[in-house]
Regions:
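General small-molecule cofactor/ligand-binding pocket signal
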Residues: 32, 67-69, 128
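Helix-adjacent hinge/juxtasegments
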Residues: 55, 59, 63-64, 69
């Protein structure tokens, strides 16, 4: 399963979906996040979070054995195509920069995506949670 920044932040910020997202992560055989998605989450908590939330980010990834995946040339090509097909201002999915890396990782590995919102549900990727 591929973890999108939106789901990771929902957990860290204890939003409504946090418990369902944490359960999906716990139940998954493997969970990965693009290094670009990790950086996006880290920038958010560094800018908006307190010391506790900053520490929670890395602790959460460690506790749930979430793997940071490097960006490959293949993923860059897939991310570029994702923006052309589903990007902000181009398609209702409105994928942003970070979303395109999540899309590319999920597409390359053929894995479902755990995300918050409706952006990825308007693409050709499989959601990790239906709804």
């Amino acid at each position: 399963m591929i973890l999108d920044t939106s789901a990771l932040l929902a957990i860290l910020l204890r939003e409504t979906e946090a418990a369902a997202f944490a359960k999906a992560i716990e139940d998954a055989d493997s969970v990965r996040i693009s290094v670009a998605g990790y950086l996006e989450a880290a920038i958010f908590v560094d800018r908006h979070g307190d010391e506790v939330r900053r520490a929670m980010l890395d602790t959460f990834l460690e506790e749930f054995s979430i793997r940071l995946e490097p960006v490959t040339v293949q993923q860059i090509r897939l991310a570029r195509q994702a923006f052309r097909s589903f990007g902000k201002g181009i398609h209702p999915a409105g994928l942003n920069f970070g979303d395109c890396f999540t899309y590319a990782l999920a597409k390359a590995l053929r894995e479902p995506v755990l995300f918050k919102g409706t952006d990825f549900s308007q693409t050709d990727l499989l959601p990790a949670i239906e709804g």
